[in-house]
């Protein structure tokens, strides 16, 4: 008989943890005592319409501040500023960068993200068909092309935490295949986390799933 106790499966180490988070927007309570662990690799946040998927991404990005609760990065308490510094997130509805070109937008991110990968960006520009749009002001781009600009920035950023809302929306087939490939790479990372919000899991990707329901997060 072995002297060693039977091995037990251990949960992945959390890169980011949310504890007892309460978020209210106006008269609407979005989350009540929400607890969540985000491990390195790929995580899907899913749920019904208006369940809080986008709001959760904004919380994790430090773009929203909850009424109560706490966040921890690598086990260390993290305020909104720390979350912003660790993450890449862009609100796809924002017009804040509409007057500059995609190329200028990407160039401005290189100083913010020390692990910015210029070669990855070059590959993404080709894979997403952005070469002909790179020097146009963003307001001239279609919704799908603007989304590609954000996606290229996300995957090239080298951020510890990448947050993407509906990564396949408004994409052509070739671009969707490119995004799927990059998400597949993100799923294998042992040091970075990619969190996507969508209505269902993309086929063929190894990921963890978190269901949002009635203000709570449930591991699926």
Region roles according to the model:
Residues 151:
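Hydrophobic anchor residue at the start of the ABC signature
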Residues 137-144:
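Conserved ABC ATPase signature
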Residues 118-133:
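Conserved ABC ATPase "signature" region
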Residues 61-111, 201-202:
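ABC ATPase nucleotide-binding domain signature region
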Residues 165, 171-172, 176:
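ABC-family nucleotide-binding domains
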Residues 47, 55-59, 208:
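The short alpha-helix immediately C-terminal to the Walker A/P-loop
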Residues 2-40:
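A short, flexible loop at the N-terminus of ABC-type nucleotide-binding domains that lies
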């Amino acid at each position: 008989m072995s002297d060693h106790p039977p091995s037990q499966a251990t949960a992945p180490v959390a890169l980011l943890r949310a504890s007892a988070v309460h978020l209210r927007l106006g008269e609407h309570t979005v989350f009540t005592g929400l607890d969540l662990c985000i491990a390195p690799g790929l995580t899907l946040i899913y749920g019904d319409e208006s369940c809080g998927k986008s709001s959760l991404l904004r919380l994790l990005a430090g773009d929203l501040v909850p009424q109560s609760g706490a966040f921890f990065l690598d086990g260390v308490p993290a305020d909104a500023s720390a979350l912003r510094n660790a993450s890449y997130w862009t609100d796809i509805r924002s017009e804040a960068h509409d007057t500059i070109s995609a190329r200028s937008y990407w160039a401005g991110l290189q100083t913010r993200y020390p692990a910015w990968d210029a070669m990855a960006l070059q590959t993404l520009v080709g894979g997403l068909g952005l070469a002909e749009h790179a020097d146009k002001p963003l307001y001239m781009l279609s919704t799908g092309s603007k989304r590609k600009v954000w996606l290229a920035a996300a995957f090239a950023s080298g951020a510890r935490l990448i947050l993407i809302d509906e990564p396949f929306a408004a994409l052509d087939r070739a671009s969707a295949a490119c995004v799927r490939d990059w998400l597949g790479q993100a799923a294998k990372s042992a040091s970075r986390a990619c969190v996507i919000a969508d209505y269902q899991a993309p086929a063929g990707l190894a990921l963890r799933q978190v269901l949002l329901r009635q203000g709570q997060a449930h591991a699926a």
